Amino acid sequence: MTAIDPHIMKQINCFIQTLAPLHPQAAYRIAVVEAYNTQKHVFKGMFLVQAPYYLVLSAKDHPFAAVNAGYVMEQLVLYLVSKGFATCYLGDAKSKPDLDQYQPMIVVAFGKAAATAVKKPASRKKLTELVNQPPVAQQNVRKIIEAARIAPSAFNLQPWRFMPQDGKIHIFMKKESLMQTKRMKELTLLDMGIAMCHMALAAEELWLDWRLSREDTSNEPIWKGCQYVATLYYEI
């Protein structure tokens, strides 16, 4: 496994400092773990991959810690991919707790790709399966939802659902079985953060004024079988 040039690693660390959180009050840390000098797995768990480097995001306990972790980490993953690095989310990787009550949330393996990879098109739900009232007529709204539609998710569950309205898109998470494990619930919330990162970047590329927030509890939209997560407001 190949080490990354120190100058490039410095750029990566500098980019980490510029990440924009979804919930600023949800404290988190990102550590870069070097493993290019070992052939052993650095983490425990299932579905692991060996890589020269790993990103470990740890967060303090907060109602929106998992959503925020996904939102922040996906910014970093997309940055690394744009620079030619290969990345892989390790949903089951187990890391030791950080200091000061920070708990590991998600691990991402990354490094220089061994060869130019040709990725097969991922299986995704149709856009009409993800919105409450298809079709989506407004072009910008369709592009924003499409950006979320192609986002990665644990076990490709694609838990996101969308309710477009004038000037806003309500974002929902499909409710899963009551037997769902605590970690699986956490991964689903991480997935929602990843999808919202894609939506935010799409809105930015469309030159829209936008913000992500939540409706007041008394005014939360309702979708049977789904849980309200957030709303993306936009102005053209």
Identify the residue ranges that each predicted region occupies.
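Acidic, surface-exposed loops and disordered segments
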Residues: M1-I236
